[in-house]
Amino acid sequence: MSTPLITPDLVAVDLVATDRDDATRQLIDLLYAAGRVTDADGFHADVRAREAQMATGMPGGIGLPHARSSHVTVPSLAVGKVAAGVDFGAPDGPATLVFLIAAPDAGDGDHLKILAALARRLVHESFRTALTDARSADEVADIVTREVVPS
């Protein structure tokens, strides 16, 4: 991928959200502002449709909304840290780390590779702790790039 999967402008370290839909929308707005999504409302509808199929909460305080969409220009990952937590349907409670994967409609392979690589890292408490402890968007983007993005 020539465009980085994640950059600091796609990270919200102090995300305050009322629910998962609000958290997702705020991350979509970051993608839109960065020019990675052409229609924020359209992509939001695609993410909602995917969420309606199955909850995307994972154990360990993780929300992992994702969708392929014609409104996405390049595979991207936006991250939000939500101190108060947001319910993404995980059995162990609210998510404090939210990862929004956005992939172009034609990007089946990219979407699955990103999802698989991220899921492999998220099972490790040390990875989740490093992200939780990171104080800046630069730190979060660096950790994700180092640990998730294939070299």
What does each of the following model-derived ranges do?
Residues 1-151:
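Cytosolic covalent-transfer regions centered on His/Cys nucleophiles
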